[in-house]
From Swiss-Prot:
Protein family membership: Belongs to the GCKR family.
Annotated positions binding beta-D-fructose 6-phosphate: T109, S110, S179, V180, G181, K514
Residues reported to bind beta-D-fructose 1-phosphate: T109, S110, E153, S179, V180, G181, E348, K514
Tissue-level expression: Detected in liver (at protein level). Not detected in muscle, brain, heart, testis, intestine or spleen.
Listed GO biological process terms: carbohydrate derivative metabolic process; glucose metabolic process; intracellular glucose homeostasis; protein import into nucleus; protein localization to nucleus; response to fructose; response to glucose; triglyceride homeostasis
Organism: Rattus norvegicus (Rat)
Alphabetical list of Gene3D superfamilies matching this protein: 1.10.8.1080, 3.40.50.12620, Glucose-6-phosphate isomerase like protein, domain 1 (3.40.50.10490)
Name of protein: Glucokinase regulatory protein
Amino acid sequence: MPGTKRYQHVIETPEPGEWELSGYEAAVPITEKSNPLTRNLDKADAEKIVKLLGQCDAEIFQEEGQIVPTYQRLYSESVLTTMLQVAGKVQEVLKEPDGGLVVLSGGGTSGRMAFLMSVSFNQLMKGLGQKPLYTYLIAGGDRSVVASREQTEDSALHGIEELKKVAAGKKRVVVIGISVGLSAPFVAGQMDYCMDNTAVFLPVLVGFNPVSMARNDPIEDWRSTFRQVAERMQKMQEKQEAFVLNPAIGPEGLSGSSRMKGGGATKILLETLLLAAHKTVDQGVVSSQRCLLEILRTFERAHQVTYSQSSKIATLMKQVGISLEKKGRVHLVGWQTLGIIAIMDGVECIHTFGADFQDIRGFLIGDHSDMFNQKDELTNQGPQFTFSQDDFLTSILPSLTETDTVVFIFTLDDNLTEVQALAERVREKCQNIQALVHSTVGQSLPAPLKKLFPSLISITWPLLFFDYEGTYVQKFQRELSTKWVLNTVSTGAHVLLGKILQNHMLDLRIANSKLFWRALAMLQRFSGQSKARCIESLLQAIHFPQPLSDDVRAAPISCHVQVAHEKEKVIPTALLSLLLRCSISEAKARLSAASSVCEVVRSALSGPGQKRSTQALEDPPACGTLN
């Protein structure tokens, strides 16, 4: 409610909204709910899409409201207190680095964020002449950083084995497990293992659902559900032997797309507490709440500065949409860690939108020799694992066409001679060359370089006078800003292409168990039919043309995922079959003849005899079995 905010904010955060009401999609976790702000996202133009997604991102900084039930938020006293406690535990490792380690771990987007942050904080420590103490784990290994391999996060044992390898011989290990929806088995196994070995390990769980909404279906290779693991951690938190950091940040602008707000909030929360730990460790004091609030406000400022460029972001979105509509390709060429953000955005479009890996791709310009755990995993693995400057020059530049779009992403502190030389080579092949440029007050883009870009988004940051660790605030701001711009552009471009129904992505690839349950929830939502009927239709679409046997029906979810993640249009096929009461083959034929997946589904939804609520879900599709 107005006037209830405890802290002074840089941006105008939304008041608590409809999604907080106890009856709103009650069967669905917050991270999987549909956001009321974007209910009509599919009807919005580019400018409106930017505005709506910007409002969703602002919800990260929203304080607790007066509506019951009240979820704890990023600025809640309980969350800030836990952040300080975790920062103190990290400081213990920093003060006695011999035998110490900080592990950041996750699957998919969360694992890529773990990679990015471990790179950043190791760079920070090297700059101080200190031995780097951070490492990362990502489900599926280093190949999952640069390619879509979301199915690898479904094994708890895989997570434990990877943790044992990096922690071998260490005396004190802080393990920060990131799972936006509190659902990834890869992380659950690690947290359980840490709680069984507290003499060495301190587990910290980061996610954005209440523990009561953590996934509660059985993990195929583990003894506990994710919810049981999280509940155990809550009990151990009383003795500070484990911690759970799980503020609510509201539903995603595109339902369930945790690469967006979930990824951004992960970055904000962890960089705030880790930077606070580093800033105060030499002063011999534990980080203060004031220190946390100062850093959080700089991230709020990043939101303000980024979305002040909304009209230019919309222009870039439209250009990217045009390229994709014409079957062209979009190349995001980023310098240093901005290149990592670019790679992440491209990779995540594959399972989110059912995109081809070549549709939107990121490339990293700069030295990455000491970033990866196992760089050999990325050598000679095929075109979908290419991401370097050499890869761009040899495999992309020669084949650029006029339907492609190339976006340069850099700061004015980067090597501008190098930027200009590459931009000139690209301009010889392709006129659709854009730029996202970060500068500090007083810096200006050289005229010869500026002329190369017909359109550019120029984001100017205020001067910050911080100590050495504090200079990383601006680096983190620029990364977050770049993430917001690219996520908004790639999401919006797919909205403009007609890929979205309301604020749901129907044509996502079912790449892991989380996406299997999301697919089932969408079928229930839009068909209004029973859970059993929706399961039957989903399995028929997955295994087509093979008929469903009782053995197939009884198979573990991992077996269905293994088949589904190689197939396209599984969910639309199943939904059409339900809506039209037709066979899978007839549904596939209708989709093949249609210009847009969502248009043919809309037509079926508005057909005679279709009586259903698109808001109502029957039972939570997280029961653990398909019976």
